[in-house]
UniProtKB/Swiss-Prot annotation:
This is Nucleotide-binding protein Dshi_0209. Transmembrane segments: none annotated. Coiled coil: none annotated. Pfam families: PapZ_C (PF22740), RapZ-like_N (PF03668). GO terms for molecular function: ATP binding; GTP binding. InterPro entries: P-loop_NTPase (IPR027417), RapZ-like (IPR005337), RapZ-like_N (IPR053930), RapZ_C (IPR053931). Belongs to the RapZ-like family. Keywords: ATP-binding, GTP-binding, Nucleotide-binding. GTP binds at residues 67-70. PANTHER family: RNASE ADAPTER PROTEIN RAPZ (PTHR30448:SF0). It comes from the Bacteria.
């Protein structure tokens, strides 16, 4: 039996060209595509785009941001690029055009106090009118047009997911870390749990030099009569919140467990929660801050 499934070398390179008037949300859209697994390149010279197809196949789809500030940008250059990509079997390209009403664009420029790139010495309204005329032929050729006039950044991210991703594409990267309260709570930790109420293996001579990755330490900590109830409630809370965070467009969540020394109890709970989440299909990485410091110190 012959395997006819396409090989990665034969799969066309997915490319989304993102353009639109200044202030319509192009940067937000590109960041959303990046969260969906795209490799994002903003303001790449148009003449260089075809060269991306000449190199080795890329593992991820491409999101390319183009606007009036892009080098060699013109209606003709964009039209030629679209024609070239449409004719090249190595490319699967779409043109996304983000738009907004002149009133909304004017308000956004006023709120940010930015100068319009096409009218740096004039009012934003002059630049908006000029850019609208310039981009009209490109808008007419777009595969997808999204009007962001009434969209919040969160709404725009949801639109990007609807058009260019699926629920599994918007992966939430989770970091579960242990730390010592002697050094304080790590910066950037979203959820913090204090596990110093659990019994401490430090006071057992046979466990003192071990850490929470060791099964003997985990068994000791788990034997605390309060452990099961505590862990089950924490795990249930995290399971409840993770889908909600993902739906809100959050791309990373950091969960921290702290104990006195950052060696036994916090490591144990972090290891167990990580294992439970990985078993459920979540993308999880572990960080044991105190253990890492000791490893570095031992090597230096």
């Amino acid at each position: 039996m012959t395997d006819t499934a396409p090989t990665p070398e034969k799969m066309p390179q997915k490319i989304v060209l993102v353009t639109g008037p200044s202030g319509a949300g192009r940067t937000t859209a590109i960041r959303a595509l990046e969260d969906l697994g795209f490799e994002a390149i903003d303001n790449m010279p148009i003449s260089l785009v075809p060269r991306l197809l000449d190199g080795p196949p890329l593992a991820r789809p491409l999101a390319l941001g183009l606007d009036a500030r892009t080098r060699d940008f013109s209606v003709t250059a964009v039209a030629d690029l679209l024609h070239l990509l449409a004719e090249d079997p190595r490319a699967d390209a779409q043109l996304l055009f983000l738009d907004a009403s002149p009133r909304v664009l004017t308000r956004r420029f006023s709120e940010t106090r930015r100068r319009h790139p096409l009218a740096p010495l004039e009012s934003p309204m002059d630049g908006i009118a000029r850019e609208t005329d310039l981009l009209a032929p490109i808008r007419a050729r777009a595969d997808v047009v999204i009007d962001t006039s009434e969209l919040s950044p969160h709404d725009l991210r949801a639109e990007m997911l609807r058009w260019f991703g699926d629920r599994d594409s918007l992966r939430l990267a989770i970091t579960v870390q242990s730390f010592s309260y002697k050094r304080g709570v790590p910066q950037g930790t979203d959820m913090v749990f204090d596990v110093r109420f659990l019994r401490n293996p430090y006071w057992e001579d046979t466990l003192r030099r071990l850490d929470g990755r060791d099964a003997r330490v985990q068994d000791y900590v788990s034997a605390d009569p309060r452990f099961d109830s505590f862990f089950d409630n924490i795990a249930s809370l995290v399971r409840l919140l993770l889908p909600a965070y993902r739906e809100e467009g959050k791309s990373h969540l950091s969960i921290g467990f702290g104990c006195t020394g950052g060696q036994h109890r916090s490591v144990t709970v972090a290891e167990k929660l990580s294992a439970a989440l990985v078993a459920e299909g979540w993308q999880v990485s572990n960080r044991h801050l105190e253990l890492s410091r000791r490893s570095i110190g031992a090597q230096s």
